[in-house]
A protein has these predicted regions:
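Non-catalytic, polymerase-adjacent accessory regions of viral genome-replication enzymes
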Residues: 1-51, 394, 400-408, 418-427
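Active-site-proximal segment of RNA-dependent polymerases
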Residues: 95-150
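Conserved pre-motif C helix in the palm subdomain of viral-like polymerases
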Residues: 76-106, 208-237
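Conserved polymerase palm-domain catalytic core
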Residues: 132-247, 251-268, 286
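A common structural junction motif
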Residues: 268-276
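Right-hand nucleic-acid polymerase module
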Residues: 88-92, 205, 234, 261, ...
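Glycine- and acidic
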Residues: 76-80, 107-109, 140, 210-218, ...
Length: 427
């Protein structure tokens, strides 16, 4: 039976709901997904899918929306795609089912989007490598991985994997080979399992044609990203070379600089054979005494901490927000307490509270893995300096008129304190 048949099964949806709500899932997301299940909103999407399977040249799945996300910390822009609300939710279930049914395809060095595996698990497993502190490392990112994967090269791999489920392959092929995307954003409604404003584009939305790879941002992209470089993962596994991949992030280790350079060349060659390239700005070859950075973590001997680049990124966000709130305060002749309270609310939410769609919070991502508070103290100190600036309007010694007790009264929560609370609870 095709996996597509499971998409109309209420029991499968209840299992999916239990899984989603077992994670860091905000109440409004739970409520929206619950309503979607109770109203059987997935049935109409299942009909759309069956229509595509029966006549893929005549029937088409609703188009994904194309969005451009600007990264405030750089001049880069990231292109992401989102299907309409109901369709996106059904594709999430399909992805959930595929990642579990086909997990045995993947070797142990792959950690992304897999059941019972995670970025944190990757870091902990790397720490178990024998004589890791004596090894050289080479880390690299695949350049624009999701949107650069050549669909014509992916399809044969996908067809081979799904040879016993031709209906599923027909449907996925129709999505991957659809040349059009929607541009209009104003008519997209809130998704039933997301607190962001994505989904449900109207029929009159403007469309364009473009090469979009596996469409970063869509649920199924995670399965495709794992599958496409499966043979590279397997090569390193078969040769018993210490290696890990999390989607487009790759790291490999060797006993000598010459050895690890050879592995790096092998990675670049395999990527080129797959129509991909490395991001030269993200290449790092490190000596044993330097430690290494992977997935936002810095590892050196037995120490696991937040990576310096991640600390810098958070400090930049805080500085921008503090300056923005200071302008807002001055323009509206508001008291410093109001601006400081807004700053605290923003970063409490960003660092400590659940985000949309069961994403891990910043703190949970790091707290479950790091074993030192050094970086947290740096971030705490910088955050407190921003709050002092907003309260006093100055960077001079007068800023110390604002006391730590004042911060707490406005709702401030220290990362170091939150970390120790987390570790005590986890014991």
């Amino acid at each position: 039976m095709s996996l597509l048949k499971e998409l109309s099964n209420p029991e499968i949806w209840e299992q999916f709901y239990a899984y989603k709500t077992s994670l860091a899932c905000p109440k409004d997301v739970k409520r929206q997904l619950r309503g979607f299940l109770d109203e059987r909103g997935y049935l109409s999407v299942c009909d759309e899918i069956q229509a595509v399977v029966k006549a893929p040249l005549e029937n088409h799945f609703p188009l994904p929306r194309r969005s451009v996300i600007s990264k405030q910390s750089s001049q880069k822009k990231r292109i992401v795609y989102t299907y309409p609300q109901a369709e996106n939710t059904v594709l999430k279930l399909l992805t959930y089912l595929m990642l579990r049914k086909y997990d045995s395809l993947f070797s142990d060095g792959l950690y992304s989007f897999r059941p019972n595996r995670s970025a944190n698990g990757a870091v902990r497993d790397l720490m178990k490598i024998q004589n890791l502190h004596l090894k050289y490392s080479y880390k690299v990112d695949v350049s624009n991985y999701f949107n650069s994967i050549p669909v014509e090269r992916l399809l044969p791999k996908l067809e081979e994997v799904l040879r016993e489920d031709p209906e599923l392959f027909t449907f996925l092929k129709s999505l991957l080979t659809e040349p059009c995307v929607a541009l209009r954003e104003s008519n997209w409604a809130k998704a039933p399992d997301s607190s962001s404003e994505d989904a449900n584009v109207k029929e009159q939305a403007k469309t364009i044609t473009e090469d979009k790879g596996i469409m970063a941002g869509t649920p199924l992209a995670s399965f495709y990203a794992n599958l496409y470089l499966r043979d590279m993962d397997q090569w390193f596994y078969d040769h018993e070379i210490p290696y890990a991949r999390y989607s487009d992030d790759i790291i490999v280790f060797g006993d000598t600089e010459e050895e690890v350079r050879k592995y790096g060349e092998k990675i670049r060659t395999l990527l080129l054979e797959h129509g991909l390239s490395v991001n030269p700005k993200k290449e790092e070859l490190r000596r044993p005494e330097e430690g290494f950075v992977f997935l936002g973590f810095y590892l050196n001997h037995d120490v696991i901490d937040v990576a310096p680049a991640s600390i810098m990124k958070m400090k930049k966000k805080m500085r921008r927000k503090a300056r923005s709130l200071m302008r807002w305060k001055d323009q509206n002749n508001l008291p410093g307490e109001k601006a400081a309270k807004a700053f605290i609310r923003v970063f409490n939410r960003k660092l400590l509270e659940s985000s949309m769609d069961s994403d891990l919070t910043w703190s949970y991502w790091y707290f479950s893995t790091i074993n030192t508070t050094d970086s947290l103290r740096v971030i705490d100190h910088y955050c407190q300096e921003c709050i002092r600036y907003l309260l006093t309007g100055t960077h001079t010694k007068a800023r110390f008129n604002a006391k730590y007790e004042d911060f707490k009264g406005l709702g401030y929560q220290s990362l170091v304190h939150a970390y120790y609370s987390f570790t005590d609870t986890s014991k």
